[in-house]
Amino acid sequence: GVPCLCDSDGPSVRGNTLSGTLWLFGCPSGWHNCKARGPTIGWCCKK
């Protein structure tokens, strides 16, 4: 999957760990949406 920035990772992608994974059709079972706003396409989810 494509890594994405969760709210808990910090305000920007620079110098922060991207702990989320981008899913186009919502988070799979057992995962949760970890970003309150965005991304434009898909959902940023983590286990």
From Swiss-Prot:
Record-level GO cellular component terms: extracellular region; nematocyst
Keywords, ordered alphabetically: Cardiotoxin, Disulfide bond, Ion channel impairing toxin, Nematocyst, Neurotoxin, Secreted, Toxin, Voltage-gated sodium channel impairing toxin
Main localization (coarse): secreted
Pfam families: Toxin_4
Secreted keyword on record: yes
Tagged with keyword Secreted: yes
One of the GO biological process terms: regulation of signal transduction
InterPro entries in UniProt: Anenome_toxin, Myo_ane_neurotoxin_sf
Localization (cell): Secreted; Nematocyst
Disulphide linkage map: 4-44, 6-34, 27-45
One Gene Ontology MF term: sodium channel regulator activity
Coiled coil segments of this chain: none
Gene3D superfamilies cross-referenced by the UniProt entry: Anthopleurin-A (2.20.20.10)
Entry similarity comment: Belongs to the sea anemone sodium channel inhibitory toxin family. Type I subfamily.
Protein's name in the database: Delta-actitoxin-Aspp1c
Source organism: Anthopleura sp. (strain 'Zhanjiang')
